Amino acid sequence: MTNGLPKHERLKGRHWFGVLFEQGRSIKRFPLKLVHTPVPEASQNLFGVSVPKRNVPAAVRRNRIKRQIREAYRLNKSIAEAHEFGALFFIYQGRESLPYTRIEQLVKELLLSYNNSIKKKNVVDEI
């Protein structure tokens, strides 16, 4: 598996955002929130990131936070690809920028929690 984040792995289109916010579940580790939903027909996870303008008004800071979250996900996406694929959408809810090491730690925690929730769901489905 490569460490890239190709275009076909990016979350795009109204359909997926509608499904995510209607049926998706969320995991929170302030200031990051992960909204996820399973996508049975997917061959890899679909990924998206958002930093609201209301929380971070300066575009330069918003873009930097988005780049940091994308990079942390790109390097750690193998954690989330262990069981089944889904749509993953990260939302930055803080008002202040964090160092990259903290963002990477939060992304790892969220991906591990996502993995655990998928495992629990699969165990319940088998019973």
Name these PLM-found stretches.
Residues 1-127:
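Positively charged, solvent-exposed patches that mediate nucleic-acid binding
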